[in-house]
Amino acid sequence: RDPEMSRGLGDVYKRQGKGQLIFKGFANIGAGAKLSIDKDASLIFDNQFWSTGPLLIIARKQIQFGRNCVLSWNISVMDHDAHDIYHGGVLTNTPQPVLFDNHCWIGFNSTILKGSIIPENSVIAANSVITKADFEKNSVIAGVPGMTIKNGVNWS
């Protein structure tokens, strides 16, 4: 770990209510991190979570990280669209959980949006935007929007 980039947790904002911030083991959250948990949301970190530098996580429903997830700098994770959109008086863009399976590596400047599932042992390339959940484990995912560019990978 780089002591210059990993100094500790930044800002944590939790709205009044039953919102939960859960750590299931060791987590290293780098300097400049901002975590926001809505009143009925949950943000869960399993054991061996690592991030460096600026990180933005905003949970309105559920964001969950599996074991041994590694996030580079300038990562954004949101389980919603930031503003409600109505059509005919009906909310059309409800929050959707974001799930990271075990052993995921997220490259710098990446954005992970609502409804995304990052599969086990996967790599998200730098500058990617992930918007869906239909990726296979052991994949490299890259681009805007994110697409599988390689299968059968492993990383350490």
Specify the residue positions occupied by each region the protein language model found.
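Extended beta-solenoid/beta-helix repeat architectures
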Residues: I29-G32, I37-D40, Q48-S51, A59, ...
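Single conserved hydrophobic/aromatic residue that forms the stacking wall/gate
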Residues: D2-Y13
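The right-handed parallel beta-helix/beta-solenoid scaffold, focusing on the short coil/turn
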Residues: D11, G19-Q20, G25, A33, ...
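Right-handed parallel beta-helix
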Residues: K39-S42, D46, S51-P54, A59-G66, ...
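Glycine-rich hexapeptide-repeat left-handed beta-helix
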Residues: F65-R67, W73-S156
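Contiguous, function-dense segments enriched for cysteine-driven chemistry
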Residues: P3-E4, G25-A27, A31-K34, D38-K39, ...
